[in-house]
């Protein structure tokens, strides 16, 4: 615990946003990470609880009190090492994770919880800026080949971990670019796509191969699921060519809402709009669903719903 009375001395400080009048004119990120000093002060608010509920609240079990303490002591390199020991892609989660760790923070019972997500964001950004995040290729090879079906965040993380222990890993992705919903479901104003490309380059340097535009399977997928593949490979072929196959497909099949009016023109699932819109922003093609000069509503307050609303405004 860096500062015993830190949680009593310091208030929570959140990341700052660009003014709405400015952010309406571009699709880029508008959140500014904490400065080094701000992150240090926020790290001082951590109480290093005997039972760190934040760890259990985190889906990847980040060792949160440890990196908070290291940031407070300005030991950024070791803070990065602690963070990366449990999280392959902190620059993703530090931007778009809903932060259940903060909901589990004990300090949040009677004060504002520790700003864990913003500290994580600051750590990984400093790690990249300082040149500390580097490829970690395995020094030895196992001779085993592993296929990863699905190039979203789960597939990317599995591929990186398996490559680092010496397996030959190939990722099969049905879209023309890797990233899954990180790339096609999340707008640039939440997370710019060069962050994914940078990680892909690191993984390629670690020996991971990416086969894009490849659909794995025999059966047709639902009409609601976007499929831009140009090639098909059967599961049997993968089983023949690889020693193991890891299935990391995303949850793209939407759940319909059986209500009056659902059948009307202009009622769309979120990803029917978001995926083509992200591809339009990437310069691929024009999104056929247009919200220009139209009144729009959304039956959702989640990240997808908010993304849809902001795209419509822009």
Question: Model regions: which residues?
Answer:
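Short beta-strands and strand-loop turn motifs
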Residues: 49, 61, 98-100, 181-184, ...
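Immediate flanking context of iron-sulfur cluster ligation sites
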Residues: 33-53, 76-100
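C-type cytochrome heme c attachment motif
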Residues: 45-48, 56-57, 103-104, 170
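Residues forming the flavin
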Residues: 1-37, 42, 120-298, 302, ...
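Catalytic cores of large soluble enzymes that bind and process phosphate-bearing ligands
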Residues: 28-35, 46, 59, 71-72, ...
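Iron-sulfur (Fe-S) cluster-binding segments and ferredoxin-like electron-carrier domains
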Residues: 3-28, 53-78, 100-126
